C-alpha cells in the first residue's frame, strides 16, 4: 500500500511551518528483514517488508521471558563497536503518535489520525472514501476532544516529554561512548516523521536505529509508522542505502519490566493497606478485527507484558490481585475486551475498595492518562464504590528506563541493513490477502453498515461523546 502525503501524516489543513526536529525512542525489528541480538540470540519477532506493506514471519521466542536476561553495557557496547566502523554517523529516530499543542490543532490532528489507513482499515476498492470518513469523524469528535484537551491545559504535553526523552537517551548513549544524533518523528502532528527523515538525510546519517515509543507492537501504532518509513526510504536513493534497524517491540526487556515494577511498588506504598490494593492495568485498545483478521500481535504481547511485570512483583513479595482491561474504544465495531470503564464499575460493585491504575501502553503522559484515566475513570471508579484511587505515572524520564532504551539502541546497531539489500525485501502476501475475496466482501458490507450508523442521529450523538 503506497503511502500518500495524507496517509503519511502531513496535515492538509494547516500551512507548513519551520519546526525544529526533536527525537524519539525504542522498538525492535526492521525496514529490512532485521533481527536484533542479545547474547548471540535473535530477539523478538521477525518482520519483513513487502511490496504491499508489513508481513510477520515467525515469532522467534514464544515465551517473552526467554529474552529478558540481564544485558550489561560492557557486553552490548563491545559487540556494537565490533560491527560499527568508526566513520559511521549514528542516528536514532524516536517514533510517537503526536498530539495537538493548542485547541485549534485538535480537529486537523484528528483528521490526520483517522485518515491513516492503519486506523480505519478499508478494502482497497474503497480507500478513496478514507478522506471523507476522516473529515466526518474529525468534525464530529472535535468539540468533545477539545473539552478533554482544555481540561489538561489546552494541549498535549507529548511533544515536550518526547523531546526530553530524546535528550536523555542521547546523554545516556554518550555516557556509554556512543555518539548519536537523536530525532523525534510524530505520526499525526508536528514534528512529522517526514520532517525527521529529511533532517536525518541532511545530517548525512550513515547508520540508523528506529525506536518506536510503544512497548508492544500494533498495526495501528508501530506498524503504521514503519509503513510511512518504508515508503520514504524506498523513494530516496540515499536513504535506501542507509543501514537501518528497527526495535519493533520491547515490552519483554528486563529494564522495562523492572522499571514498571519499581513504579508500581512505589505507588502501592501510598495506600494505607498496600496488600489489599487491586493493580489495574489499563491498555489502549484496538479493534478485534486487527487481531483476528490482520494478525496483529498486540493482545498477545500485552498479556505477556502483564505476566512479566506481575512475575517480577511476585519475586519481590508483592502478591496483589491484578486485572487487565482496554480503554479508548471508538465507533460501532468490537474492540478488545474487557473494557476499562465496564471493569471499573464491576470492581467497585464487587467490593474492591482500593485500586491502583497502571497505564501500561504509554511511556509518556498525554490525553489518555491525564484526562481519560485521571479524570473520567477515576470519577467512574469512585462512583462505583472504590474508595481509594491511585495511578502509576508514565515512565517518562525514569533513569532505569532511559538507560534500558539506550542499551536497546546499542544492541540493535549490528543488525542494521540497507534497504537496497536484495535480501532485505521479501515479496510475500500480507495477512489481509490470504482470502482476498472474502475480506473485500466483509469490508464492503461493513463499510455500508458503518456509513448508515455514522449518518444516523443516534450514532452522531454517540461519536460526539467518545
UniProtKB/Swiss-Prot annotation:
Cellular component aspect of the GO annotation? chloroplast; chloroplast membrane; chloroplast thylakoid membrane; mitochondrion; plastid
The primary location reported for this protein is plastid
Q: Which CDD domains match?
A: Ferrochelatase_C (cd00419), Ferrochelatase_N (cd03411)
The protein's induction, as recorded, is: Induced by sucrose, wounding, oxidative stress, salicylic acid, and during hypersensitive response to TMV infection. Up-regulated by wounding and reactive oxygen species. Not regulated by methyl jasmonate.
Q: When the coding gene is removed by deletion, what phenotypic consequences does the entry describe?
A: No visible phenotype, but decreased heme content in roots.
Query: Is Nucleotide-binding a UniProt keyword of this protein?
Result: no
Q: Which reaction does it catalyse?
A: heme b + 2 H(+) = protoporphyrin IX + Fe(2+)
What keywords tag this UniProt record? Chloroplast, Heme biosynthesis, Iron, Lyase, Membrane, Mitochondrion, Plastid, Porphyrin biosynthesis, Thylakoid, Transit peptide
Provide the GO MF annotations for this entry: ferrochelatase activity
Which pathway does the record list? Porphyrin-containing compound metabolism; protoheme biosynthesis; protoheme from protoporphyrin-IX: step 1/1
Q: Transit peptide span, please give it.
A: 1-35
The UniProt entry lists membrane topology as: Peripheral membrane protein
Origin, by domain of life?
Answer: Eukaryota
The similarity annotation says:
Belongs to the ferrochelatase family.
Identification of the protein by name: Ferrochelatase-1, chloroplastic/mitochondrial
- Source organism of the structure: Arabidopsis thaliana
Lineage of producing organism:
Eukaryota, Viridiplantae, Streptophyta, Embryophyta, Tracheophyta
Amino acid at each position: 500500500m503506497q503511502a500518500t502525503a495524507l496517509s503519511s501524516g502531513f496535515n492538509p489543513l494547516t500551512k507548513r511551518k519551520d519546526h525544529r526536529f526533536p527525537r524519539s525512542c525504542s522498538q525492535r525489528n526492521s525496514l529490512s528483514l532485521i533481527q536484533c541480538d542479545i547474547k548471540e540470540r535473535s530477539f523478538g519477532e521477525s518482520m519483513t517488508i513487502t511490496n504491499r506493506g508489513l508481513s510477520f514471519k515467525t515469532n522467534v521466542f514464544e515465551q517473552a521471558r526467554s529474552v529478558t536476561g540481564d544485558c550489561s553495557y560492557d557486553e552490548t557496547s563491545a559487540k556494537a563497536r565490533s560491527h560499527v566502523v568508526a566513520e559511521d554517523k549514528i542516528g536514532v529516530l524516536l517514533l510517537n503518535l503526536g498530539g495537538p499543542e493548542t485547541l485549534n490543532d485538535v480537529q486537523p490532528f484528528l483528521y490526520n489520525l483517522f485518515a491513516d489507513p492503519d486506523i480505519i482499515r478499508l478494502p482497497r476498492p474503497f480507500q478513496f472514501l478514507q478522506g471523507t470518513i476522516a473529515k466526518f469523524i474529525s468534525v464530529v469528535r472535535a468539540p468533545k476532544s477539545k473539552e478533554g484537551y482544555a481540561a489538561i491545559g489546552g494541549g498535549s504535553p507529548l511533544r515536550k516529554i518526547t523531546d526530553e526523552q530524546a535528550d536523555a537517551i542521547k546523554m545516556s548513549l554518550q555516557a556509554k561512548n556512543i555518539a548519536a544524533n537523536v530525532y523525534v518523528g510524530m505520526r499525526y502532528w508536528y514534528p512529522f516523521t517526514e520532517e525527521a527523515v529529511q533532517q536525518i538525510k541532511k545530517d548525512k546519517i550513515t547508520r540508523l536505529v528506529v525506536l518506536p515509543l510503544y512497548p508492544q507492537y500494533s498495526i495501528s501504532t508501530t506498524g503504521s509508522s514503519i509503513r510511512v518509513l518504508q515508503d520514504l526510504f524506498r523513494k530516496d536513493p540515499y536513504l535506501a542505502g542507509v543501514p537501518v534497524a528497527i526495535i519493533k517491540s520491547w515490552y519483554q526487556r528486563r529494564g522495562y519490566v523492572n522499571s514498571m515494577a519499581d513504579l508500581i511498588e512505589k505507588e502501592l506504598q501510598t495506600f494505607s493497606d498496600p496488600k489489599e490494593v487491586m493493580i489495574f492495568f489499563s491498555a489502549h485498545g484496538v479493534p478485534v478485527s486487527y487481531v483476528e483478521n490482520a494478525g496483529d500481535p498486540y493482545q498477545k504481547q500485552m498479556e505477556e507484558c502483564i505476566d512479566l511485570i506481575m512475575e517480577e512483583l511476585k519475586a519481590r513479595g508483592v502478591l496483589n490481585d491484578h486485572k487487565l482491561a482496554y480503554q479508548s474504544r471508538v465507533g460501532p465495531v468490537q474492540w478488545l475486551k474487557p473494557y476499562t470503564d465496564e471493569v471499573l464499575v464491576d470492581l467497585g460493585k464487587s467490593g474492591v475498595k482500593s485500586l491502583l491504575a497502571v497505564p501500561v501502553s504509554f511511556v509518556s503522559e498525554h490525553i489518555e492518562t491525564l484526562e481519560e484515566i485521571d479524570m473520567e475513570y477515576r470519577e467512574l471508579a469512585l462512583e462505583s464504590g472504590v474508595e481509594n484511587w491511585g495511578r502509576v505515572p508514565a515512565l517518562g524520564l525514569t533513569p532505569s528506563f532511559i538507560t534500558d532504551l539506550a542499551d536497546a539502541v546499542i544492541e540493535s546497531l549490528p543488525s542494521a541493513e540497507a534497504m537496497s539489500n536484495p535480501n532485505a525485501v521479501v515479496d510475500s502476501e500480507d495477512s489481509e490477502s490470504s482470502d482476498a475475496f472474502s475480506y473485500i466482501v466483509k469490508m464492503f458490507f461493513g463499510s455500508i453498515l458503518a456509513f448508515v450508523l455514522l449518518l444516523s442521529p443516534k450514532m452522531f450523538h454517540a461519536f460526539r461523546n467518545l
